[in-house]
Amino acid sequence: MTFAKITQAAHYVPENVVSNDDLSKIMDTNDEWIYSRTGIKNRHISTGENTSDLATKVAKQLIENSGVDPELIDFIIVATVTPDSMMPSTAARVQAQVGATNAFAYDLTAACSGFVFALSTAEKLISSGAYQRGIVIGAEVFSKVIDWSDRSTAVLFGDGAAGVLLDNSGSQPLIIAEKMQTDGKRGGSLLSSYADIQTPFASVSYEGSNLSMEGRAIFDFAVRDVPKNIQATLEKSDLAAEEIDYYLLHQANSRILDKMAKKLGVTRNKFLQNMQEYGNTSAASIPILLSESVKNGIFSLDGQTKVVLTGFGGGLTWGTAIINL
């Protein structure tokens, strides 16, 4: 059998750091108010780089660190809800910039669950035997869709990108078990870049494209539905919650992670966290955490670590993959 394996991980964030104190100068907020409610201290905000620029820097790191000829890359998937444009896709822009001339490339839109959904897809592409090597990236520049006058959302988000290189060299399944979910009926609780009908033949007025969020509804969704998804995936894997080495969850809010750890009966320090430095980077949050963990020696990519990856957010979407890293 053919098994996919993650062989490289990389991340990139803009140099410009915006602290809670910086935000207090442009809106009615302060460090204590933000940190006590979210666990966020800083976020990196782009001053000129677009989503494809961030993603390209990640892809170049993955290729350079692996020594792989970019022409041997079979596919590139970029998970994002803040693309440079709808056409061409962010992934197509990355493909051109890194010289992956033989790769097919496309964007996947699943908000904060995007990286987990994309990794699941990539694993199937490789384990099918049809493709040997691919790149999966989560990349966001949320600063371009935020309403900077709305303190309820502006304090939460940051910009960044991260990803992994996969190939067919695995000696065991990459994904032990998974469960992906969507509930479009609740999709209106988190909206961004809404594109209304605008033609000479329609009388519909244009509505703004800034991000809007029903904070309480999203918080309740995260603490009620997501732990059930993780538990169901654990049951499919025949693993107990404490048998997992680390939990890498979407970095939305430290209080959400506190509640999830308690509901699952898992030691809180198994839930890795870096939102204090990056804020909520949507599809980029899980791979940034993964890449940082490898860089900092928390775990390596030797196939010996069992990790839960869980994303949750707009769509509504949520999903878990238990993987051998």
Swiss-Prot record:
NCBIfam families: fabH, PRK09352.1
GO molecular function ontology, one term from the record: 3-oxoacyl-[acyl-carrier-protein] synthase activity
Organism for this UniProt entry: Lactococcus lactis subsp. cremoris (strain SK11)
Assembly and binders: Homodimer.
Compartment(s) where it occurs, according to its Swiss-Prot or TrEMBL record: Cytoplasm
GO biological process, one term: fatty acid biosynthetic process
Protein origin, superkingdom: Bacteria
Protein's UniProt name: Beta-ketoacyl-[acyl-carrier-protein] synthase III
Family stated for the protein in its record: Belongs to the thiolase-like superfamily. FabH family.
Primary gene name: fabH
Lineage: Bacteria, Bacillati, Bacillota, Bacilli, Lactobacillales
Keyword Protein biosynthesis (UniProt): no
UniProt KW Translocase keyword: no
Documented EC number(s): 2.3.1.180
Role played: Catalyzes the condensation reaction of fatty acid synthesis by the addition to an acyl acceptor of two carbons from malonyl-ACP. Catalyzes the first condensation reaction which initiates fatty acid synthesis and may therefore play a role in governing the total rate of fatty acid production. Possesses both acetoacetyl-ACP synthase and acetyl transacylase activities. Its substrate specificity determines the biosynthesis of branched-chain and/or straight-chain of fatty acids.
Reaction(s) catalysed (UniProt annotation): malonyl-[ACP] + acetyl-CoA + H(+) = 3-oxobutanoyl-[ACP] + CO2 + CoA
Residues annotated as catalytic: 112, 250, 280
Pathway: Lipid metabolism; fatty acid biosynthesis
Stored InterPro entries: ACP_syn_III_C, ACP_syn_III_N, FabH, Thiolase-like
Keywords (A to Z) from UniProt: Acyltransferase, Cytoplasm, Fatty acid biosynthesis, Fatty acid metabolism, Lipid biosynthesis, Lipid metabolism, Multifunctional enzyme, Transferase
Gene Ontology terms: cellular component: cytoplasm
Pfam families: ACP_syn_III (PF08545), ACP_syn_III_C (PF08541)
Region described as ACP-binding: 251-255
Note on domains (UniProt): The last Arg residue of the ACP-binding site is essential for the weak association between ACP/AcpP and FabH.
